[in-house]
Amino acid sequence: MSGIVGICRTGEKQLVEKMLAKISHRGTGGKRIFAKKGGVLGVVYQKGEKPPFLNNPRGTAVWDGRFSGDLDQAETDSPLALAALKGGEVFLIRDGLGISPLYYGEVDGTLVFASEVKALIGVASKIQEFPPGYKYLSGTGFQQYFGLKPVEAWPLEQEEAALRLRRALEEAVAQYTAGRTEIGSLLSGGLDSSTLAALARPQVDRLHTFACGMEGASDLEYAREVADHIDSIHHEAIYALPDLWNVLPDVIYHLESFDALLIRSAITHYLVTKMVADYVPAAFSGEGGDELFAGYAYYKDLDPDDLNGELIASINRMHNTALQRVDRAASAYGTEAYVSFLAPSVVKLAVHIPVEYKLHAEADEEPVEKWILRKAVEDLLPEQALWRPKVKFWEGAGVEDHLADYAKTQITDADFRQERRLPDGSFLNTKEELLYYRIFTEHFGNLTDLDFVGRTKGAPKVPEPL
């Protein structure tokens, strides 16, 4: 985990210092600033990690994510946001899925960029998200180098598909366990998080698993069962409703969003990651499993011919919703999240697996979501966890509609009608979202440029006023 900032103009070291201070939580172990011909770059990083910068006759670079060190080989679908200065030109690149965050804006017509929006607010105008799968060169502008698109399924038998998926996931997890004796894994007791925890356990001496929820939440029960089954060192955070209200301002500040469904999940993610930081510097997180293997309920309503395209679209939407949540929760506490379902080898295989293996039904039975993933790990997990239906993070943790109910006590119908129109002309969906937006503006002001705020597909909403 690290954080980068920069500007495509010389003589701006003081500005870069100011921007780095806004994202200092992303790296408390070290800081470097490079003022070169063509611009100024800055990076903060965690203690103990390999410093994420290079400075040699071939060029200067700072990055967040995984980088080989070769600027000519920077195009990747592994986590990476990189900025480099070479020959007086600034080069920027973001990974193909948007796992590592990057944003940009303008200062007097000059490009400025940062890992988080908060470093740009008050500095830049026209703040936008740097698009995943793009690179930028100051002399030529933006250019797309990667885009995930629907592909033809490979002619795989069920057993072969399950075996290949198991191997790909084992290798994806091993990338992060290699050389370690201890690592963490978020564990909700659902299929995705349980899979990563079970795969990681034999690869390390000590696996710490982390679950959180309100007393009696189903996630806690399922997570305990899985933790006992795989023999992990299990930790729990049990919270009450006041804890949710109290943590909201911090969550929204780090998340940089007011999207209601995203914040619901982010609260529980934030609380569990706080616990991670007490034990290990990094933990696996199960994002990507639902999008790759058809885990969401609405997929069952789609025509089979449309399902593959919607799965690809779902993966391409993750950069400013689920992946943003994972990154901000981890960075808030100086930890790192490993999303092994989105490892390049896993994604490449998954998009070629026939969709009928993902939503699979026997005879006239209801289709089972993520069926091929369940088959790939059926020997690893207890039966209850293996066949547990999909539950949203905030539902399984016991949050359910408590946040929406709380918002109704804070915001009147008249308030909602008067305040739901945003400065950019769009509308807030619910009173819950207005509650979050009010907190958002307390942190960041009444921004007119809100293009960087991702919105969850299928979020509940009321009709827009005429």
Language-model features: where?
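Short, solvent-exposed loop/turn and secondary-structure capping segments
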Residues: 294-296
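Amphipathic, well-packed alpha-helical segments that form the structural scaffold of globular domains
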Residues: 166, 170, 174, 201, ...
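Hydrophobic (often cysteine-bearing) scaffold residues that line and stabilize catalytic clefts
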Residues: 12, 77, 158-165, 196, ...
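Cysteine-centered catalytic environments shared across enzyme families
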Residues: 1-254
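ATP-dependent adenylate-handling ligase core
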Residues: 215-273, 298-309, 328-331, 352-363, ...
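Adenosyl-5′-phosphate
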Residues: 1-4, 278-285, 291, 304-466
